[in-house]
Amino acid sequence: MASFEELIKEKSKRLEDIPLALQDAVVRQQKQVLDEISSLLNELDVKNGEIVISKANLKTISVISDDLKKVFLNEDYLKAVKKFSLEFDKQALINDKVIKAGLGTLETPIASTLYIDIAKRSAIDALIGSPIDTEFIKPIQGLLENAVVNGASLKETISSIRTFAEGNDKVDSKVLKYVKQISNDSFAVADRSYTSIVSDALQNDWFYYAGGEIDTTRCFCEERVGKNFHYKEIESWGDGKNLGDCNIGGGKWAGQIAGTNSSTIYSYLGGYNCMHSLMPISELIVSDSEKERARNLGYID
């Protein structure tokens, strides 16, 4: 049977790998989207390198939404989204193993299972529903319509759309940036919220701040990862207390998600793109120095 440390490592690795698999599918998809746009641009009337201001060109542009949506929501992308959603259930099962290894017991209330179902539906909607129209399809259509109305340079129009749809060596495309945030945050928040629901049922007092460090790890997580904390101290962070050097003013820290408080801290933790989590543990695992810190803060006798 895998140890607590081994399970934590597996769980933490998945918090990075699972969203990344979906993001890789988006990178592959961007080429198809750009090819479709290039094909559309070839149908426009152009004179001296500039797009002709005409009803015919506007009519050509007007069909782009439906065409782009078909290309964007292609079979490969839909399969990747479906696979991503199924990983929420697998992550919950791994969390069950981690909790049992850390506490020696496990109780999964029905609310935890129901929550995972809700989290999956929300993620799927964000990845294939109306937000995609708002974040990607309509902005591209807007770029093309403006190019026609203003008689813009075809070369400059193609360059602008390429940056928007495919990105470059300095910036991600608009859609990749969006999918990165949605996939990273939805998976990590679901992971933490599931654990929080189970922990509440177990009435646990101590938690291990789990996860590794990556290039984008911020001060808040960097100072806490690998340590154990009493739940009262964790909740104090949500209230803007005990932040140490990470307090950027007003009881806030860099990357903090709006709406973080003593209740939501268990789900939001370090903030946007945070891949860390709080795992319930037995007090037997907690060091004397960590208990002393909690005692000095007035959280335990």
Please identify what each model-predicted range represents:
Residues K170-V286:
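Acidic, glycine-rich two-metal-ion catalytic cores of nucleic acid-processing enzymes
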